[in-house]
Amino acid sequence: LTAFITYLSQVLTALNFLANIFLQGTRAAASNRRLSEVMNTRPDISDDGASRREYRVEKGSIEFRNVSFRYFKNVGAPVLDDVSVKIEPGEFVGIIGSTGSGKSTFVSLIPRLDDPDAGEVLVDGINVKELSLYELRESVAVVLQKNTLFSGTVAENLRWGNEEATDEELEEVCRIAQADSFIRSFPDGYETQIGQGGGNLSGGQKQRLCIARALLKKPKIMILDDSTSAVDTATDAAIRRAFRTQLSHVTKLVIALRISSVMDADKILVLDEGRLAACGTHEELIQSCEAYQEIYYSQKEEGHE
């Protein structure tokens, strides 16, 4: 009887093992189908079958001419509605507006993550639709509020921006992004291991590393979408000063919730329900733009200024 029970137990264990293999195989097949769907999906915007100008962006000027955009064609109000503005090479431009005003959509049209329904977006005076996607996107660096960091060293994560970057270049961009000091405080410095997603770093440290990584691209246009939200105001101000003194040749667009992050911008765009409500310096807008005044004084009362 003991032998029978032992053999039966072994048979049941084997059957259970086979059942698990079958279950895992079924799951793997389903995962493969989903991956295949993603891999075989053609992007809405591509260079396939089109003749593009192999022009490398040199100046970084940006112009929106009567641009309108909807995410769902002919449904609902436009996210951007007849927006026209010109941004000169090297300018520091702040973008302010309430949630849903179209700020992120505005900057997404520059590297052609989306195309406008009407109007034109020009870079260096050329419609972005006429430019090679590769050359256009090589000239634009985008830093989001939440970016991805990978398992590996600090240096390895930074070099995703430029695999050929030297150690000196890494240190230079980290000084601009105000990241060099905290990196050097780690026992292993630039060889410090980062956990998946940057779990062993603070939010502000992750954002500064992502800014440094974007700078390694040596872009002509730099877009920061609320990418210093987790950084204290003193460090935020230091980053802006470094941008002004060391990145005067780069056109900088900064989306910010805190007006203090863009008060010293060359110009500030105020978006309100998809329309460009006003454009000017902080001093001009505080006198003339009701939407800007409302944001400024509400933040001042809350102690953000």
Language model features: what each stretch is:
Residues 24-27, 44, 70-75:
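An intracellular "coupling" helix at the cytosolic face of ABC transporter transmembrane type-1 domains
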Residues 37, 44, 159:
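Conserved E/DxxT/N motif and adjacent residues on the DHp alpha2 helix
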Residues 1-6:
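Membrane-water interface of transmembrane alpha-helices in multipass transporters/channels
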Residues 10-38:
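Cytosolic ends of transmembrane helices, especially the final helix of ABC transmembrane type-1 domains
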Residues 14, 21, 38-41, 265, ...:
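Amphipathic, soluble alpha-helical interaction motifs
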Residues 49-54:
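Short, solvent-exposed loop/turn elements at beta->coil junctions and helix N-caps
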Residues 44-48, 123-125:
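Short gly/ser/thr-rich secondary-structure transition/capping motifs
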Residues 55-305:
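ABC-type nucleotide-binding domain
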